Amino acid sequence: MTFHEEDLDQAEEVHVRSLTAAEADGDERAVEAALRPRTLDEVVGQVRVRDQLGLVLEAARRRGRAPDHVLLSGPPGLGKTTLAMIIASEMGAPLRLTSGPAITHAGDLAAILSGMNEGDVLFVDEIHRMSRPAEEMLYMAMEDFRVDVVIGKGPGATAIPLEIPPFTLVGATTRAGLLPGPLRDRFGFTAHLEFYEPDELDLIVQRSARLLDVHVLPDGTAEIASRSRGTPRIANRLLRRVRDFAQVRADGVVTLPVAQDALDLYEVDQLGLDRLDRGVLDVLCRRFGGGPVGISTLAVAVGEERETVEEVAEPFLVRNGFLARTPRGRVATPAAWEHLGLTAPPTLTLPESDPPLFED
């Protein structure tokens, strides 16, 4: 893949502006960063991924070379960005962060790559949303550590190779199936992050409570963990909201009743369903008789973007048996009807298997 020399300055400006905006994202992001594990040993859960990744990094250290490129996939909030930061930290390398939507032209990517030093780690979040020209340039950069710079225009144009020091690309995606095969095949290590178990989330909440200096009793952390949808990011967010409730409406100690009252106030029920989840199920059951309904129609009916329903609500609802994906659309399960206090149609049938959540 090639790009024109005159695109470089403009692309450099675009990248710097996007990167600065991402870093200055308010107090919420700063608190989340403070709660992130710093090493693989501090990571709770994801045992298989943690062990495999640790082996890859240790082998690279012993060889004195940059690790293979890494692709991390899975639902939002499970720790893909955290693992990218840990990879850089474990290798003692600088981390450069950007995102797929910010790389709209091949020149954007070339500007980033031209500033890389040997051993640097480049993290591209939402890598499946990169532009096609940038993807094609990335093929050569990942495999041969070079890109072609085009000098001039028309018949007299000349392509000059630009050498790039060996680096490690860490790509993160919630939709691995949208990545072209040639790009996916260039990652030496791929891992899919799974939802966390309640006991793992309990440990995460306990750790975060210590870092935030929140007094939480064991039954309080367990309650927060059980309503966190298997997602550490949500667990930490709920902990902060429960902390606020405890400080304002209680004596500052997060007990089981305090946690329950706080989470009920924020409309997170005992199974972890929030307003969006219940809205999806309610529309599906009441308006469409349980389905099947196409995802786009369902998103319009609940007043959300398709991506929000598909990537935030749907994985949790499918995993917990409230929603089924069929070739004809989404179908509410008997558990969904029961959770809403409704009676399921007597003819309700479900498919034996569903297509993968994140592969198409």
Curated annotation (Swiss-Prot):
Cell location: Cytoplasm
Taxonomic placement: Bacteria, Bacillati, Actinomycetota, Actinomycetes, Propionibacteriales
Gene Ontology BP annotations: DNA recombination; DNA repair
CDD domains xref list: AAA (cd00009)
Catalytic activity: ATP + H2O = ADP + phosphate + H(+)
Main subcellular localisation: cytoplasm
InterPro entries in alphabetical order: AAA+_ATPase, AAA_lid_4, DNA_helicase_Holl-junc_RuvB, P-loop_NTPase, RuvB-like_N, RuvB_C, WH-like_DNA-bd_sf, WH_DNA-bd_sf
PANTHER family tied to this protein: HOLLIDAY JUNCTION BRANCH MIGRATION COMPLEX SUBUNIT RUVB (PTHR42848:SF1), PTHR42848
Coiled-coil blocks: none
MF-aspect GO terms: ATP binding; ATP hydrolysis activity; four-way junction DNA binding; four-way junction helicase activity
Protein name listed in UniProt: Holliday junction branch migration complex subunit RuvB
Subunit structure: Homohexamer. Forms an RuvA(8)-RuvB(12)-Holliday junction (HJ) complex. HJ DNA is sandwiched between 2 RuvA tetramers; dsDNA enters through RuvA and exits via RuvB. An RuvB hexamer assembles on each DNA strand where it exits the tetramer. Each RuvB hexamer is contacted by two RuvA subunits (via domain III) on 2 adjacent RuvB subunits; this complex drives branch migration. In the full resolvosome a probable DNA-RuvA(4)-RuvB(12)-RuvC(2) complex forms which resolves the HJ.
Alphabetized HAMAP family for the sequence: DNA_HJ_migration_RuvB
Annotated EC: 3.6.4.-
Binding-site residues for ATP, renumbered to this chain: L35, R36, G77, K80, T81, T82, E143, D144, F145, R186, Y196, R233
Function: The RuvA-RuvB-RuvC complex processes Holliday junction (HJ) DNA during genetic recombination and DNA repair, while the RuvA-RuvB complex plays an important role in the rescue of blocked DNA replication forks via replication fork reversal (RFR). RuvA specifically binds to HJ cruciform DNA, conferring on it an open structure. The RuvB hexamer acts as an ATP-dependent pump, pulling dsDNA into and through the RuvAB complex. RuvB forms 2 homohexamers on either side of HJ DNA bound by 1 or 2 RuvA tetramers; 4 subunits per hexamer contact DNA at a time.
